[in-house]
Amino acid sequence: MAEAILAVRGGLGAKSRLAAVFSDAERAALVEAMLLDMLDALAGAGAGAVRRVWVVTPTERLERLAAAAGARVIREPRPAGLNAAFRCGLAAAAEEAPYADIVLLPGDLPTLRAQDVDAALLLLRTHDLVLALASRDGGTGLLAVRAGVPFTPQFGAQSCARHRRQARARGLSCALVEAGSLALDLDRPEDAVEVARGPCGRRTAEVLSDLKSRWRAQ
């Protein structure tokens, strides 16, 4: 069974690249909606696939929401970036489940589907590392690591290539999982339009409903 770690930052300053589309309050609500939709998706993963979900966040409200949804929460004292958040989550998970597989997910995948997580974990049975390529910037939508395999998260733009280089340097077998729900992170206005056009989590769809109206009016 795997330990899933989500890293997410909320509050009024979250998702600043969406400021042209959403107000501060709307962006904060969007982050909350995406987190809860992702937790729902992970809860629907195949029997025994995900043992526990950890949420790493510096945001008090997200801490409360994640805990109420049944996640284990690690509260960061201050925002320190995505990779620092994942390192924090990895350390905590290693203490409680040192022999578990690990799945790292940024908290902005509003179309996440349980079956795509299952597909990644199925590949992990025969590989040391599984990656999902983000569609727009070459980033990483998912990073899954087999139990006991040493690996350092390097999320960010073009990070999928960095992760693959690190795997080669360490002599690790690596597979790519092709899944649309792991490729679309909602970070820019054009991402919001794409998510609004298709199926996504219920809460995210509600927050995006106003954007849909604006888009149709154009």
Curated annotation (Swiss-Prot):
Q: Which cysteines are joined by disulfide bonds?
A: none
**Keyword GTP-binding set for record:** yes
Q: Which EC class heads this enzyme's classification? A: transferase
HAMAP family recorded for this chain?
CofC
Which GO MF term does the entry hold, naming one? GTP binding
Which species expresses this protein natively? Answer: Phenylobacterium zucineum (strain HLK1)
Q: Name one Pfam family in it.
A: CofC
| Annotated PANTHER family | 2-PHOSPHO-L-LACTATE GUANYLYLTRANSFERASE
Q: Any idea which UniProt keywords this protein has?
A: GTP-binding, Nucleotide-binding, Nucleotidyltransferase, Transferase
Please explain the role this protein plays, according to its UniProt record: Guanylyltransferase that catalyzes the activation of (2R)-3-phosphoglycerate (3PG) as 3-[(R)-glyceryl]-diphospho-5'-guanosine, via the condensation of 3PG with GTP. It is involved in the biosynthesis of a derivative of the hydride carrier cofactor coenzyme F420, 3PG-F420.
Q: Name one GO biological process term.
A: F420-0 metabolic process
This protein's pathway: Cofactor biosynthesis; coenzyme F420 biosynthesis
Name the protein family: Belongs to the CofC family.
Name the chain's protein: 3-phospho-D-glycerate guanylyltransferase
**Enzyme Commission no:** 2.7.7.106
